[in-house]
Regions:
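Extracytosolic ligand-binding ectodomains
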Residues: 1-271
Length: 271
């Protein structure tokens, strides 16, 4: 069963309750870190396993998940370090950050800032925008006032254009921008109506290690994808999330507690 609901916490919990009522013992998701954090207690209480392919918030390492939660994407503590290293390699000495005000955005912004400052850089400002905002001019103006060498944008598609369009109008796209996985989409410039204005933008995103497994996955995916593309952001991790639960269920049993008991073993060995 696939469930997509509104953004409010009530709808998030209802989405999970819907699949639990259908007898689900394992759930692949949620996609957004904030959503998973909002519904994890519900899953734990129902003894239903959640495995997310795209939750990257560092917050998950700090909470007790009772064994019923796992993720196949790395923490943004790693991405923050990689992004900071990229900035330093490019000679950036000062940076300003504009980010979503949620667990994903704050976690990645803080991780990036800490790593960049540890490497000798200076963070001019971090500006957070509300996740349900529809107008971002004041936030864009604030991040531009920092006068930094570069700007980091930690955004989602539904808000990314709202940030980039006023940035274009204010001439801020002449400053180097570094984006993250939330807007890793080759069609972003077209979606935002910005033509070639985003050419040259750089960024970071979780990926998969090169090798036979990655090549085999991309070949198989290309055969069934509508446009023949070999993959998309978090697609390999989504496959891994489903297979992780399936392998554990096959070895231990199909109830939530049985699946949970074998997640660590199922993810060991590298095969």
């Amino acid at each position: 069963s696939f469930v997509s609901r509104g953004l409010g916490d009530v709808y998030k919990r209802q989405s999970l309750n819907d699949v639990i009522a259908q007898g689900a013992q394992g759930v692949m998701g949620a996609a957004c870190s904030g959503t998973s954090l909002a519904i994890l207690d519900t899953a734990i209480a129902a003894e239903v396993v959640m495995v997310s392919p795209s939750n990257t918030s560092p917050q998950f390492t700090k909470i007790d998940k009772k064994g019923f939660y796992a993720r196949t994407a790395p923490s943004d503590l790693l991405q923050g370090d990689v992004l900071a290293s990229l900035l330093v390699e490019d000679g950036v000495q000062t940076v300003s950050i504009i980010s979503r005000a949620d667990s994903y955005g704050r976690g990645l912004a803080e991780a990036t800032a800490a790593a960049f400052e540890a490497a000798g850089g200076t963070v001019k400002t971090i500006v957070y925008h509300a996740t349900d905002a529809s107008e971002f001019t004041s936030e864009v103006t604030a991040v531009g006032k920092g006068g930094a060498d570069a700007i980091v944008g930690i955004l989602f598609p539904e808000t990314g254009c709202g940030v980039l369009q006023p940035a274009f109008e204010q001439g801020l796209l002449d400053t180097p921008w570094y984006m993250t996985d939330g807007v890793k989409d080759a069609g972003l410039a077209s979606l935002c109506g910005l033509g070639t204005a985003l050419d040259g933008f750089k960024g970071t995103a979780p990926g998969s290690a090169a090798g036979e497994a990655k090549d085999a996955f991309e070949a198989a995916y290309a055969e069934v994808s509508a446009d023949g593309s070999p993959t998309f952001i978090f697609a390999p991790q989504a496959y891994d999330a489903v297979m992780l639960m399936a392998i554990s269920a096959a070895a231990n049993g199909v109830t939530g507690p049985e699946i949970a008991s074998g997640l660590v073993a199922a993810s060991s060995g590298g095969e």
